[in-house]
Amino acid sequence: MKRKEIIDDVTMKRAITRITYEIIERNKNLDNIVLAGIKTRGVFLAKRIQERLKQLENLDIPVGELDTKPFRDDMKVEVDTTTMPVDITDKDIILIDDVLYTGRTIRAAIDNLVSLGRPSRVSLAVLIDRGHRELPIRADYVGKNIPTSQFEEILVEVMEHDGYDRVSIIDPS
């Protein structure tokens, strides 16, 4: 198994900052935004974007934590650990995840969202888009596009969970 670091902590911070600026530029009413981090690492990324929005725009944007496992078609988990601090009805939701791959996690996240309320709009921000979609889903905000083979894996590590800020490609061969 080979591991190659492709994004370090500085590059990751820049990508998150770029996503934050794009969110500011594309959303006329920032007061209507709710960030929804997809567990696990998407939550930490959402909190970082929330912090940058506070620094740049002096806004306190709510952050929810979406558990997609009960909504996936490839596993069955009974307990839903989703937390959403506000009613999402008529809100502009920005889903945040670490890696966009097949699109199945995002589909499950959207199913979870609509079980909570009826947002006016849902968009998607991801740190890494690696391609290989199985569903017609695309990200609105992308930190980095990193094409991979289907055999490779992308490993995102964040300081809050893993002790490092980095992204690596794992080649199992």
Swiss-Prot record:
Subunit details: Homodimer and homohexamer; in equilibrium.
Catalytic activity of the protein: UMP + diphosphate = 5-phospho-alpha-D-ribose 1-diphosphate + uracil
Key words, A-Z: Glycosyltransferase, RNA-binding, Transcription, Transcription regulation, Transcription termination, Transferase
GO molecular function: RNA binding; uracil phosphoribosyltransferase activity
Tree of life domain: Bacteria
Top EC category: transferase
Alphabetical list of Pfam families matching this protein: Pribosyltran
SUPFAM superfamilies: PRTase-like
Species for this entry: Streptococcus agalactiae serotype V (strain ATCC BAA-611 / 2603 V/R)
GO biological process, one term: DNA-templated transcription termination
InterPro entries reported in the protein's UniProt record: PRibTrfase_dom (IPR000836), PRTase-like (IPR029057), PyrR (IPR023050), PyrR_bifunctional (IPR050137)
Entries under HAMAP family matching the protein: PyrR
Gene3D superfamilies for the chain: 3.40.50.2020
NCBIfam families: PRK05205.1-4 (NF003548), PRK05205.1-5 (NF003549)
Gene that this polypeptide is encoded by: pyrR
Role this protein plays: Regulates transcriptional attenuation of the pyrimidine nucleotide (pyr) operon by binding in a uridine-dependent manner to specific sites on pyr mRNA. This disrupts an antiterminator hairpin in the RNA and favors formation of a downstream transcription terminator, leading to a reduced expression of downstream genes. Also displays a weak uracil phosphoribosyltransferase activity which is not physiologically significant.
EC number, as in UniProt: 2.4.2.9
Location of the motif PRPP-binding: 93-105
Protein name per UniProt: Bifunctional protein PyrR
Family from the record: Belongs to the purine/pyrimidine phosphoribosyltransferase family. PyrR subfamily.
